[in-house]
Amino acid sequence: HLLNVKIGMTFSGGVIDFLLFGVLPNRTAWWLVIPVGLVFAVIYYFGFRFAIRKWDLATPGREKTVEEAPKAEAAAAGDLPYEVLAALGGKENIEHLDACITRLRVSVHDIGRVDKDRLKALGAAGVLEVGNNVQAIFGPKSDMLKGQIQDIMQGKAPARAEEKPKTAASEAAESETIASPMSGEIVPLAEVPDQVFSQKMMGDGFAVMPTDGTVVSPVDGKIINVFPTKHAIGIQSAGGHEILIHVGIDTVKLNGQGFEALVKEGDEVKKGQPILRVDLDYVKQNAPSIVTPVIFTNLQAGETVHVNKQGPVARGEDAVVTIR
């Protein structure tokens, strides 16, 4: 306005607007924009550079790193539930505590008291925050953590988590083929409407948009986890890979309605054997999505997931995915 330069713009005020509304009509002193822009560029650069260094602002790439040592110490001492509760702001900060097979779901009174960096140092693969709700991605041990934290809040000594030796995929096997657990359509993880899966916080894998409600084992192996609400099942393959089949999104809230488990923990299963029945119509009506992520939670360094098929797939169809 001071220089009487008048150039219109649509959305971004970028170079296209500059050309269309300034240079081409040639009805205003558009050339003055260039020296003014250069002056502001210098002001912005040195102004923000000074502010960032003066007040140590956490711009991308300059975030403070979190020490990882406390993670091992807490786990070794059996104090993980106490540490997690403290990182959530303590007993008095907890409004509601819940969990599913992937994460702790916590409503808190004061989100400012939640130490997200500490939760990550304690083993959370990620921490999601929406309003006063926190989701800490602790994987299959989330439900055990929930029970232990509830015991602490009630003044009881928490039950010790059963120490299960960590399973490593067999180094002898060069690769392992995975069958589709459901009929439907193969969907990339990136398209799953839950960032815990789409951002691979629990591991790599694939997803199926199912067309019928029978779930079969994608491998020969052993059932290692059947979640109480039956919406998710963990399997250890003969090759040592741990596989999580999570039917639908936010289906933990259905409290088992629409799900019938056909196996129990410890059962040996064969590839293609039915392990779960799902009332898809009920789940469609009561959950955000029926898309079913299949996650490999213990991939070793250098192992990659290769999705060999796109589009329609049949339940039990072999080699839709290869791990190698």
Swiss-Prot record:
**Record-given protein name:** PTS system glucose-specific EIICBA component
Q: Where is the PTS EIIC type-1 domain?
A: 1-63
Q: Region entry Disordered: which residue ranges? A: 156-177
Provide the species name.
Geobacillus stearothermophilus
Q: Pfam families given for it?
A: PTS_EIIA_1 (PF00358), PTS_EIIB (PF00367)
Entry function: The phosphoenolpyruvate-dependent sugar phosphotransferase system (sugar PTS), a major carbohydrate active transport system, catalyzes the phosphorylation of incoming sugar substrates concomitantly with their translocation across the cell membrane. This system is involved in glucose transport.
Enumerate the spans annotated as PTS EIIA type-1 domain: 194-298
- Single GO MF descriptor: kinase activity
Which Gene Ontology cellular component annotation is one that this UniProt entry carries? Answer: plasma membrane
Q: Choose any GO biological process term that the UniProt entry carries and state it.
A: phosphoenolpyruvate-dependent sugar phosphotransferase system
Spell out the InterPro entries in the cross-references: Dup_hybrid_motif, Glu_permease_IIB, PTrfase_EIIB_Cys, PTS_EIIA_1_perm, PTS_EIIA_component, PTS_IIB_1
Task: Please give the start and end residues of each transmembrane region.
Answer: 5-25, 28-48
Q: Which cysteines are joined by disulfide bonds?
A: none
Kindly give the membrane topology term recorded for this protein. Answer: Multi-pass membrane protein
Q: Which CDD domains match?
A: PTS_IIA_glc, PTS_IIB_glc
Q: Which residue intervals are annotated with compositional bias (Low complexity) in the record?
A: 167-177
Q: What is known of its domains?
A: The EIIC domain forms the PTS system translocation channel and contains the specific substrate-binding site.
Task: Tell me the keywords, alphabetical order.
Answer: Cell membrane, Kinase, Membrane, Phosphotransferase system, Sugar transport, Transferase, Transmembrane, Transmembrane helix, Transport
Question: So where's the catalytic machinery, residue-wise?
Answer: C100 (phosphocysteine intermediate), H246 (tele-phosphohistidine intermediate)
Localization, per the record, is: Cell membrane
Start and end residues of each PTS EIIB type-1 domain? 78-159
* EC assignment: 2.7.1.199
